[in-house]
Amino acid sequence: GELFVMDDGWFGNKYPRNGGNSSLGDWEVCKEKLPEGIEGLLASARKHHIKFGIWIEPEMSNTKSELFEKHPDWILKIDNRPLSTGRGKTQVVLDLTNPKVQDFVFGVVDNLMANYPEISYMKWDDNCSLLDYGSSYLPKNKQSHLYIEYNRGLQKVLQRIRAKYPELVMQLCAGGGAR
């Protein structure tokens, strides 16, 4: 059957996603852009007998986001050095070695599925390589294991999603082979 995918730009209220430099991490529907919310899109999909999918990039944040304002310690960074950024000169990578961050990332999918169970597909993007090899969560003697622990954290999140939503089709993509 046919599938409509709502791509990047559907989220962010304090910082509406109007380009690549804000709002990653603020996974709330932008009321200005979608006054009927995702519910309106789902109703249209039902009317036209097509499935609905949605784009997310839950491993990332922007320095211009509510998430970054609330949890700057959730970002991969090296102490006493300027923060490296990716797309839009504001994109940063969340620290998936941290169980609280793993819970947040799982929660992105879980909240969408709880609120919109008709979602049949998620495009999980990853448009930023790990830029700063430093974790405020890992102890000093484990910093050299950052990439391994990051991927273990990602696998834990994906296993939780698959266990709870076995029918959800997910496409994990990585711009430029970032993963």
Language-model features: locations:
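Acidic/aromatic-lined carbohydrate-recognition and catalytic surfaces
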Residues: 11-69, 163
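Catalytic domains of carbohydrate-active enzymes, especially glycoside hydrolases
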Residues: 1-11
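A cross-family glycoside hydrolase active-site/sugar-binding cleft signature
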Residues: 5-7, 53-57, 123-125, 171-173
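Active-site neighborhood of glycoside hydrolase catalytic domains
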Residues: 30-48, 69-179
